[in-house]
Design a protein with these regions (language model features):
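Alpha-helix C-terminal capping segments
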Residues: 148, 171-175, 231, 248
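Residues at the starts of beta-strands that form the adenosine-phosphate
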Residues: 152-153, 177-180, 254
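Histidine-anchored nucleotide/phosphate-binding helix
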Residues: 160-180
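Electropositive, gly/pro-rich neighborhoods at or near active sites that engage anionic ligands
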Residues: 1-151
Length: 289
């Protein structure tokens, strides 16, 4: 998915919010924004927005020396999600369609995206999860449901901290011995890393790998050889979040994208209303097995 002109204001906002996560110094905020605006003037608009996000956060790290400005927010949302897990699991267990409800909850958890809304509160996230209990799924859910039992090698690409606890509810309904969970290789925004997978208890359930990258998405050319090997071997890939949709939507692979369409550009690209919960099969599904 290419960057559009409507992406530019969001990129600038994200850069400023990230700078404010690191420091209260207006001079540093201005320094970073001036540099980012100069980069944006020269950027290749055919690239997905996460390419730019990666550059922004590398520059933020270079200027401030702070490796993980979102660590405190990630801890807060992990704690919130952990508290919600028991009653959500109980709802799933009592449901007439546990797999469907688990998927809906996992996708609703994609609201915990501080790249889209750096001011997201725990209360807002909690309300979103409650609303998901009745919100419909748009797109290709029934197709995904039919493919899960046949899959021999499932790759589940996580998106954000906090959200990864809700991913667990869906992963618990998959054939665990066939599942590999992938997280980011290094901190970027509030994206999930190995530490978040460990906090959610997923390392004790399934194989966990990282992609070796610090991009807020999955840029295969920037990922580790091991991750790319696992990606190519998978016959079913569940890719969570908008960043993974932006970076993988042109890849020929058996991918289902699971995300909340928080951004109007992505909602239009996916053919859904903003705020919708989406399951979308790749237009280039590639070969299985």
């Amino acid at each position: 998915m290419q960057t559009t002109l409507d992406c530019i204001p969001c990129i600038v906002r994200q850069a400023l919010e990230s700078a404010r996560f690191v420091s209260v110094d207006p001079a540093l905020h201005e320094q970073l924004l001036r540099h980012i605006l100069a980069l944006l003037a020269r950027m290749d608009m055919t690239l997905p927005p996460p390419f730019v996000g990666q550059i922004i956060h590398r520059e933020l790290h270079r200027i401030t020396g702070v490796d993980d400005p979102y660590w405190e927010a990630k801890e807060r949302f992990n704690h919130l999600a952990a508290e919600m897990l028991p009653w959500l699991r109980q709802m799933i267990d009592r449901s007439s369609d546990p797999l469907f409800l688990a998927a809906r909850i996992a996708i609703a958890g994609n609201i915990i995206d501080l790249g889209i809304n750096g001011a997201l509160s725990e209360a807002e996230a909690g309300r979103s999860m409650e609303e998901a209990l009745t919100q419909p799924l748009n797109g290709d859910w029934e197709l995904l449901r039919s493919e899960i039992p046949q899959a021999k090698r499932v790759l589940y690409i996580a998106d954000n901290a906090g959200e990864i606890f809700f991913d667990r509810l869906l992963i618990e309904r998959l054939p665990l011995e066939r599942v590999t969970l992938a997280v980011r290789g290094r901190p970027i925004l509030n994206d999930a890393t190995r530490e978040d997978a460990r906090c959610a208890g997923l390392d004790a359930m399934v194989a966990v790998i990282d992609n070796g990258s610090d991009a807020p998405g999955t840029i295969l050319a920037d990922c580790s050889t091991g991750f790319v090997r696992t990606f190519k071997a998978a016959d079913l890939i569940l890719a969570k979040g908008q960043g993974n949709f932006e970076t993988l939507s042109e890849e020929s692979a058996p991918i289902f994208f699971l995300f909340k369409a928080k951004c109007p550009v992505i909602a239009a690209h996916a053919g859904v209303e903003q705020g919708a919960l989406v399951v979308l099969r790749s237009k280039l599904p590639g070969k299985k097995g």
